């Protein structure tokens, strides 16, 4: 879970600030104090889903290739605990969540099944009440029209398709083959 103030450099995260300041307290305490400074300003929540069904050879993302649903669920269970901890943090510090934007990236968040995705969204909604944008990156090879409608029903307002190139030769070279017809079908009403 990565949270940063909207409009600030996204590399400016509390843990990095804590490391630079060399406090004589635990990083958690420093992170908490730094976060309290920003937690009522509009915030952006980024959730990294590090799983993909297939490796694209150009990819430098932190990811794991797997179709093991138990492994993905194990990760998701821990991510949900992190979200619960954040919600509890707001409550214990008598604060209201100022999360205004949410972005799921990866890997590919579309590698989550619908139940997993809905559970994740429900946990987020338990602490984020005024979301202006909810974005999800998807691998167009892993979704269909029904999936896109499902994402919308969960509150997603923007979908980014991972289209790297339309040239079949380039697609083959990067191990990301997706015919233009596939994209056209997803974008056509």
What are these regions (language model features)?
Residues 1-46, 53-54, 93-96:
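Flexible, acidic/Gly-rich N-terminal and inter-domain linker regions that tether
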Residues 12, 39, 59-61, 121:
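Generic recognition of cysteine residues
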Residues 63-89, 99-189:
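Conserved non-cysteine loop/helix-boundary elements of the Radical SAM core domain that shape
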Residues 47-63:
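Local cysteine-cluster metal-coordination motifs and their immediate loop/turn environment
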